Amino acid sequence: MRPLTIIGPTGTGKSDLAIEIADRLSGKIAVEIVNADAYQLYRGMDIGTGKVPLAQRRGIPHHQLDVLDVTETATVAGYQRSAAADIEAIASRGALPLLVGGSMLYVQSLLDDWAFPAKDPAIRARWERRLAQVGPARLHAELVRRDPAAAAVIPLNDARRTVRALEVVEITGRPYAASAPRIGSPRWDSAIIGLDCETKVLDERLAARTKAMFDRGLIEEVISLLPCGLARGVTASRALGYAQVMEALKAGADTQALDSARQQTCLATRRYVRRQRSWFRRDRRVRWLDATVSTAAHRTAIIEAVLGAWRRAS
């Protein structure tokens, strides 16, 4: 069965919509949800990632949730292999694979069946030594000189992606982006729906979302994960909210530090949303729906529009 994909910025209600769609199809078509959020892969990282609690999943099978320990490194290539296998297995059972998430590379690696550039451990080790010597900012400046286009989309503090880009540029002799496939027909002919809303409204939702995360126990969740190795995790330690809380804990965890962590989490999430919008909006295959209004009638209209687009594609 042809998959349905729901993408869009953080805070637009993608996960809730997926469950509502599965409910709407209940008794007609079985639906299984496949996560495409990098940090929801991690066990124990629930509150800060916006993971739908088990009790609220309404018995709908979910895949690619809670599959990694916080000390394990999440990779796009590893996710692509596992999620593609899930999607094909779901379809083979006659069920609808519903891919949901906002991690840009994870979504595109699946929909465009990326082939990943080769790796060279010796070259990577050399760049990692360089990183240890000069730090993330100066290494990123090196990427600016070698591949300005890659540097423009890789955040200054994302040392892991900076190292990978420099490795690929050295191996291939071409810009990092040249290794990415062109956007064509989506894999499995998936219907792709994008959710977004007015910036002012989304900013308000992100502020409320951040407050709710802290009120529900994000700080306690981070503290509980520290003995599990959260601070050592290459990927998990960079998650929005978790990184900011760990900094506050290092600073003494007083009221001022924790308030700052909440403010910085909200600001970082807004910056991330801008990157998500920039990335997803360039994909002309996406049918965008406005999730600004949250009334029951408008929600019903969105569900009908999503199902209509999927049925037409099928």
From Swiss-Prot:
Site entry (Interaction with substrate tRNA), positions: S103, R124
Cofactors that this protein relies on: Mg(2+)
UniProt: ATP binding residues: G8, P9, T10, G11, T12, G13, K14, S15
The organism's place on the tree of life at top rank: Bacteria
A Gene Ontology biological process term: tRNA modification
Keywords of the record: ATP-binding, Magnesium, Nucleotide-binding, Transferase, tRNA processing
Keyword Hydrolase in annotation: no
Binding residue positions for substrate: T10, G11, T12, G13, K14, S15
Signal peptide annotation: none
Enzymatic class: transferase
UniProt GO MF annotations: ATP binding; tRNA dimethylallyltransferase activity
Task performed by this protein: Catalyzes the transfer of a dimethylallyl group onto the adenine at position 37 in tRNAs that read codons beginning with uridine, leading to the formation of N6-(dimethylallyl)adenosine (i(6)A).
Sequence similarity: Belongs to the IPP transferase family.
Protein name: tRNA dimethylallyltransferase 1
Higher taxonomy: Bacteria, Bacillati, Actinomycetota, Actinomycetes, Mycobacteriales
GN (gene name): miaA1
